[in-house]
Amino acid sequence: MQLKTVEGDVAKLAARGEAPTAGLSDFLVRDTPVAYAFIGPAFFLLLFLVAYPFVLSLWFSLSDARVGETGSFVGLDNFARLLRSGIFLQTLQNSIVFTAAALTLKTVLGMILALLLFRLVRFKRLIRGAVLLPFIVPTALSTLVWWWMFEPLYSVVNWTLKSLHIVNYDIPWLPDPYLAMFTVILVNTWRGLPFFAITLLAGLVAIPRELYEAAESDGAGPIGRFWHVTVPLLKPVLAVVILFSAIFTLADFNIVYVLTKGGPFNMTHLFATYSFVLGLQSGQIGQGAAVSLFLFPILLAVVFVQLRMVRKAAMYD
Amino acid sequence: MARVSRRQFLRVTAGGAAGALALGRAPAVAQTRELTFLSIASFVPETDKELKRQFEEWGAKNKVKVRLDIIAHLQLQTKKAAEVQARSGHDLTALGPGLGDADLYFDYLADLNDVATDVAPKNGGWLSQSDYLIRGKWKLLPWWQPPFPMAVRTDLLEKLGEKSPDTWEDWLRVGKKGKAMGHPFGTAMGHSGDANVTLLSILWSYGGSYVGKDGKTITINSKETRQAMDFVKRLYTEAMDPEVLAWDDASNNRCLNAGKCIAIHNPISAYESAKKDKVVVPGTQKEIAEVIDHIHTPRGPADRKATTGFWCVGIWNFSKNVDLAKDFLRYHFQPENLNKWVEAGHGFNMPFLTNLTRHPVYKSDKQYRFIPEVAKVTVPPSWPGPNTAASQQVWDLYIIPDMFAQHATGKMTADQAIAWAEKEMQEIYAGRKRKP
């Protein structure tokens, strides 16, 4: 069996690396004021839309701000208070379980899907496009459809299972805390899978075919080729995808808000949903900000380590 | 047509904009007065149509441009917070559920003492004035409440040989029998407003409460609470389906109208929609509205009490039209306008004014006969404590439903669940102490 590589795609990617446009770019690079002018808008956008809200939320988390009040500095009081709250500790646990499970599923299934898409010969474009659908449809909308499918009274999933005589009772998808967690993980995985699959596919396409041929002539089987050629060469892509997805998954709001509102008894609350309830619905902006910033130091460390890994892997190339 | 070049256009518009900015107000042409009102979508949509009609009528009389924005009730909390944070938005706003907003947004709501005093005598006085005064002031007008009777299936009760269940224990018995024939009892126990309402009603009916009159002491740890929790555990395991843990505010309506539930603790909205949509009992040609009846909210061993969403209306003090807004409130709260509005809402929207609880609509259909009775035993959600931002947070975080659910599902013992709720509530009340 031979893994196919789409040579055309590789050639195109390689071609994109060069592309000399000497005259104009030389002028622009040398002209420092012009460069600043071009960077300016993006810089100000970042400053006002990212840096300012971030610093503000940092301040909120260290203050006793409520809706309408700027509040005064209280140090780490909000964080201490959160650690005393049963709901928050539950939220912390949920977030870790949710992110770990969803990421694992997305990585494994995403890899499988990418390998399948890679080997696809007929209707390639159509199928690759269709795979992206869950990622494109607005989450609030698609999750609502999932809610209809799992809704306790009219669940079409239960109806189907019962009609096929697989079960003879209604499975409490959303009322049972563990099944509810399973359901939100399932929907998150469904939504995030295309991102993994398509990005990994791009990585696969970029792996030179000669490496597989060399491995094959050295006697490596399909599994050996996967572990010793595909995985190492995909590592940088994989690291970036997992990094991005970890951040997005941890910050998920829509899926939980639409499906469970954090219930039953807070067993599916995530940082974003709990922060929303605490900060906006109850007006405790300081504490709400503390919830959403709680993982910031940990995330920062993860980003640091992963980016280092990526850089190392790139150098290895 | 004279052609305007791009340059001319830019010069004129930029000049105009600069002028407007310098003056700090819009040019005279645009200076029509405008009053804006943020409200929530009613479960009986005719209510909103009548409100809009009155608002427009008032606007036409006073030469004021009016704009009524109606949003889903779940969006209101975030919208209010955003408007206060930005100190801008609508002039008039719906507030609630609960009177806690008056405390939470105390510094941002205009005083309504004059309006409250004006409108009360014309309508027979406020139902329970002391409940609505927050820190001794009228910061909002209590607007409407949907009282929570028991909505029941008379045909199923007849089948079971049950005459008139009146206590919570009666409903456990009925629910058990109903569940055995595929028609369980239904009350939400998850993160929804209905769960708060019904479980608080049960807690009080068994003699329990969560906060004392002083608004400080957490009183949840009591033998009455334990009794209420044991009752709810039996109700959940013996008379209901586990799906109630994931119900939202519309689920019990669906359960009744789908012909599944034997009874739900809910306002008349389920019946209203069944009637409007001509829903039939599954497998028959019979309209389900014909076999629905509404009876009194159940009694417990200690009391008969219930609560509901106390929907209110207020005026932001950062509004530039406080006086105009007050004028509209006076207009809307005139007896004839309130009467029309209650009529339009088929009584779902009962005002907190004595005369309106005796509105003819409650006699027009035998379905509504218990609604004024239920209103008499309806108390604010923080009862017997005052309405505060803290009590609002207990409601928003669903502490009461979660306490009951954690015990009912066997996740915690009664003592553990109570200890959990007590600690959460103590933290909430301690964290909400007002700055001196």
Model-derived features: where do they sit?
Chain A
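Transmembrane alpha-helical segments of polytopic membrane transport and secretion proteins
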Residues: 1-39, 122-124, 307-317
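A structural signal for multi-pass alpha-helical bundles of membrane permease subunits
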Residues: 34-317
